[in-house]
């Protein structure tokens, strides 16, 4: 108990632990808020750089990203563009390649299936995944195949 008191720099160990837990909770909330703001900012950049394929808005995100943030970006874009839109993420989470596809409900009802698209492209990153017709993710082991996987997704989108 003396050692714990020294580590916490307090004679009242229980009070010091409660204070540390409260501070930790505040820091978590602050980090979550910062992540939400960053997601909004990145989503705005992705929206500004959209392309169009066969009358469909395609929003792409490449590069190193946290998987959880990519999902948040995809859904933020869907809120801004709820029809005729597809989000394609070809990202690295650490050294792990990740593919993310989100299609709007109207496209899912007309033959676009995010899960099918992701599964096909995931082969190129030596991975697998899936999800729902509107949203799917895949992870893999071959980061070198990420660019080819992105190209495959774009090829599939253009062919539907």
Segments from the language model and where they lie:
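Terminal appendage regions of diverse proteins
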Residues: 1-160
């Amino acid at each position: 108990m003396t050692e714990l008191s020294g580590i916490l720099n307090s004679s009242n160990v229980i009070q010091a632990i409660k204070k540390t837990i409260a501070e930790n909770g505040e820091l978590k909330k602050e980090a979550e808020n910062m992540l939400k703001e960053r997601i909004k900012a990145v989503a705005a950049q992705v929206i500004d750089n959209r392309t169009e394929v066969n009358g469909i808005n395609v929003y792409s995100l490449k590069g190193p990203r946290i998987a959880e943030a990519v999902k948040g970006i995809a859904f933020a874009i869907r809120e801004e563009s709820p029809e005729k839109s597809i989000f394609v993420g070809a990202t690295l989470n650490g050294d792990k390649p990740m593919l993310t596809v989100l299609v709007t409900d109207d496209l899912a009802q007309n033959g676009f299936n995010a899960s099918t698209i992701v599964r096909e492209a995931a082969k190129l990153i030596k991975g697998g995944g899936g999800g729902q017709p509107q949203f799917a993710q895949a992870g893999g082991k071959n980061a070198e195949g990420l660019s080819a996987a992105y190209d495959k997704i774009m090829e599939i989108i253009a062919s539907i």
